[in-house]
């Protein structure tokens, strides 16, 4: 299948069908391809531009090959009725902004507000510090078996799902990704392949061209509610420096709109005010936010946490969700959730 796919994508610049994409990725994850073929596939897709069908087909193959995380108190009860939302804040990364790990801080705040969070993430591929790097620097043991991750989610209310542990077949892709050192379709697939089958998400993307595309992919993959976001300054989060483009998945359709910080009583700040560093620097920034320090960094986390609370159904609007997120920080609940996470994962 990989040879046919390469001819179609690289030679003829034709799109794959959803089924062809699924079969191609299954071959990749089955170890049936070479590093050169994987590299050609990734570059060819990047040059052609990935379609929604291709993205969905790839995601379906990765989901099928993943180690499932069985959560007893999951998003659905035995009758199939929605009970507790299960949220992920995993984004695409790859925005080259140099900011601290906003989506990881957001996950802790939202967990502090009482939402169950299955934070999917990995080590850095193209940035200084990936979500796995900063979570580890915060004291969390990320190398847990799936059963312990599920238990952590049930008992603590938040778990970090370390992608290499859940997607072991991705070992076939990593050499090509490391050598390419560029954004590829796998940046898009991380947020679409949560092993706990998260029912709601906030997904930051590195270009505005992907906002609606990723929202349509999430819709096809069965997400109940999601917000896909991209800041005007290039941030793959809701930004504090100006407008943010949003595509919201809700009630079986996608709605696009734009938001700005001042709509929610927050002041704009330059992107430089969100600058981070390595894992230790970013961990210190997150601790300061959870300690209640006022800054643009706190404000950008409030914005993103508000979006996550809306996605999880805990608030109808972001305006109503901002005070909920602020209380989770100022009451110490978010900090307490991190403490419990560190304690549980190091037992």
From Swiss-Prot:
Record keywords: Amino-acid biosynthesis, Aromatic amino acid biosynthesis, Glycosyltransferase, Magnesium, Metal-binding, Transferase, Tryptophan biosynthesis
Cofactor(s) required for function per UniProt: Mg(2+)
Disulfide bonds: none
Binding site for Mg(2+) 1: 103, 237
Keyword Cell division in record: no
GO molecular function annotation: anthranilate phosphoribosyltransferase activity; magnesium ion binding
GO process annotations (BP): L-tryptophan biosynthetic process
Catalytic function, reaction form: N-(5-phospho-beta-D-ribosyl)anthranilate + diphosphate = 5-phospho-alpha-D-ribose 1-diphosphate + anthranilate
Pathway terms, separated by semicolons: Amino-acid biosynthesis; L-tryptophan biosynthesis; L-tryptophan from chorismate: step 2/5
Sequence positions that bind anthranilate 2: 177
Record-level GO cellular component terms: cytosol
Keyword Magnesium: yes
Binding site for anthranilate 1: 91, 122
Entry EC no(s): 2.4.2.18
Residues binding Mg(2+) 2: 236-237
Role, per record: Catalyzes the transfer of the phosphoribosyl group of 5-phosphorylribose-1-pyrophosphate (PRPP) to anthranilate to yield N-(5'-phosphoribosyl)-anthranilate (PRA).
PANTHER family for this protein: ANTHRANILATE PHOSPHORIBOSYLTRANSFERASE
Family designation: Belongs to the anthranilate phosphoribosyltransferase family.
UniProt subunit comment: Homodimer.
Name under which the protein is recorded: Anthranilate phosphoribosyltransferase
Species per Swiss-Prot/TrEMBL record: Koribacter versatilis (strain Ellin345)
Lineage of producing organism: Bacteria, Pseudomonadati, Acidobacteriota, Terriglobia, Terriglobales
């Amino acid at each position: 299948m990989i040879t046919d796919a390469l001819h179609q994508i690289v030679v003829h610049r034709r799109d794959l069908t959803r089924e062809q994409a699924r079969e191609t990725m299954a071959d990749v994850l089955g170890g049936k391809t070479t590093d050169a073929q994987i590299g050609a596939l990734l570059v060819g897709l990047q040059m052609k531009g990935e379609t929604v069908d291709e993205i969905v087909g790839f995601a379906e193959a990765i989901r099928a090959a993943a180690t499932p995380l069985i959560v007893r108190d999951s998003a659905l009860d035995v009758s199939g009725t929605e009970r507790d939302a299960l949220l992920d804040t995993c984004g695409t990364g790859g925005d080259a902004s140099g900011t601290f790990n906003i989506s990881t801080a957001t996950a802790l705040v939202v967990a502090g507000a009482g939402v169950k969070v299955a934070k999917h993430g990995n080590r850095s591929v193209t940035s200084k510090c990936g979500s796995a790097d900063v979570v580890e620097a915060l004291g969390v043991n990320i190398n847990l078996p799936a059963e312990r991750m599920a238990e952590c989610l049930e008992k603590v209310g938040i778990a970090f799902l370390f992608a290499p542990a859940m997607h072991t077949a991705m070992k076939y892709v990593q050499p090509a990704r490391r050598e390419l050192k560029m954004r590829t379709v796998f940046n898009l697939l991380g947020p679409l392949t949560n092993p706990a089958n998260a029912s709601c998400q906030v997904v930051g993307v590195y270009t505005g061209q992907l906002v609606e595309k990723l929202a349509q992919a999430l819709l096809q993959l069965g997400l109940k509610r999601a917000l896909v976001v991209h800041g005007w300054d290039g941030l793959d989060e809701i930004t504090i420096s100006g407008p943010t483009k949003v595509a919201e998945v809700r009630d079986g359709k996608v709605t696009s709109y734009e938001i700005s910080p001042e709509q929610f009583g927050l002041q704009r700040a330059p992107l430089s005010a969100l600058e981070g560093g390595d894992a230790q620097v970013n961990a210190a920034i997150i601790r300061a936010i959870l300690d209640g320090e006022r800054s643009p960094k706190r404000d950008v986390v409030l914005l993103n946490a508000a979006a996550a609370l809306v996605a999880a159904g805990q608030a109808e609007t972001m305006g109503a969700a901002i005070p909920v997120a602020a209380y989770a920080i100022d009451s110490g609940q978010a900090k307490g959730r991190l403490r419990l996470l560190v304690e549980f994962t190091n037992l």
